[in-house]
Every structure is written in structure tokens, then in C-alpha cells.
């Protein structure tokens, strides 16, 4: 079944929001960084893993999910988090290491967690597969509807 006009608008807005969010984060991240990528400098602590061009994948999958469905992701989580409905302000605060972030600024961009929208990610490659399977099994055992999705990259397929 083809998406409705409203669904198409949501998908487009979500892809544009994801791209702009990541472009902005990248610009800020690289301010103050040396050519040697001294990660201690600049307003965003730690590393930054971007995923330009992958917005349609996250949006295409998450467009078919319900709020109860679970999504896990890896170290390039921004598009998936936005598509699942993670609050942009809280996610940005987390990336900047602020106390108002999703995990009080302690997780950074690779360890976003938002129980309100059933989203989690980890910087460990392929780590999200186990929790996604556990979430799906939990739903099945409790007789609850829903699915779990684990986003992984090509490097995680053989792990």
C-alpha cells in the first residue's frame, strides 16, 4: 500500500530534519578540532560518527513502526533516533554532554537512550541485535503486539 500524502510529508520532513541536524552537529563538532582530530578540543566531547545519505533507510523503516515498537542502533544513531521520535533538544543536549540530555550528558552521541520512544543505541558494533531479540521475545511472551528492529551496518553482519 502506498503511503498517504500526510505520511509522505512526515517522511520528507523527517529526512530533511535528520540531514540538517547532522550537518549542524558536524559543523559544530569540527570547530576547534585539529587536523590530528584532537578529540579533547571543541564543544562536543569524544568522537562523532555521521551517516549522511542514510536518512531514507531510517525513515522508511520507522514509518511502519508503532510507538510500542523497539529500535536499537549502533554508533551512527542520529537518523534512526530522529525517525523513532527521540526529542531533538534532549538528543542535542546529550551530544553536547549537558545534564539535560537523555542520559544526563554521560552517554554522548553513541549511547543515546530514550525509553519514552523505545530507542537505544550503543557504540559497540552489532550490540543492538541481542537487545532487539530480547525485546521481541519479551513482547511475545507477554502477549503484547509489536516488533523490534536492530539497525546494523555492513561491518556488523558477520558478527
Task: List where the protein language model places each region.
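Cofactor-/ligand-binding subdomain signature composed of acidic, glycine-rich
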Residues: 1-46, 52, 67
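Cofactor-binding active-site loop characterized by glycine-rich and histidine/acidic residues
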Residues: 35-159
Amino acid at each position: 500500500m502506498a503511503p498517504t500524502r500526510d505520511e509522505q510529508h512526515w517522511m520528507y520532513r523527517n529526512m530533511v530534519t535528520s540531514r540538517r541536524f547532522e550537518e549542524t552537529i558536524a559543523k559544530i563538532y569540527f570547530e576547534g578540532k585539529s587536523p590530528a582530530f584532537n578529540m579533547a578540543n571543541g564543544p562536543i566531547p569524544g568522537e562523532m560518527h555521521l551517516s549522511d545519505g542514510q536518512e531514507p533507510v531510517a525513515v522508511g523503516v520507522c514509518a511502519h513502526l508503532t510507538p510500542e515498537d523497539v529500535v536499537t542502533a549502533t554508533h551512527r544513531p542520529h537518523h534512526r533516533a530522529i525517525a523513532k521520535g527521540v526529542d531533538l533538544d534532549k538528543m542535542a543536549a546529550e551530544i553536547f554532554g549537558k545534564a539535560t540530555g537523555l542520559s544526563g550528558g554521560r552517554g554522548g552521541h553513541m549511547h543515546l537512550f530514550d525509553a519514552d520512544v523505545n530507542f537505544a543505541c550503543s557504540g559497540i558494533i552489532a550490540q543492538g541485535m541481542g537487545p532487539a531479540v530480547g525485546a521481541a521475545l519479551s513482547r511475545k511472551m507477554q502477549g503484547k503486539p509489536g516488533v523490534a528492529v536492530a539497525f546494523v551496518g555492513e561491518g556488523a553482519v558477520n558478527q
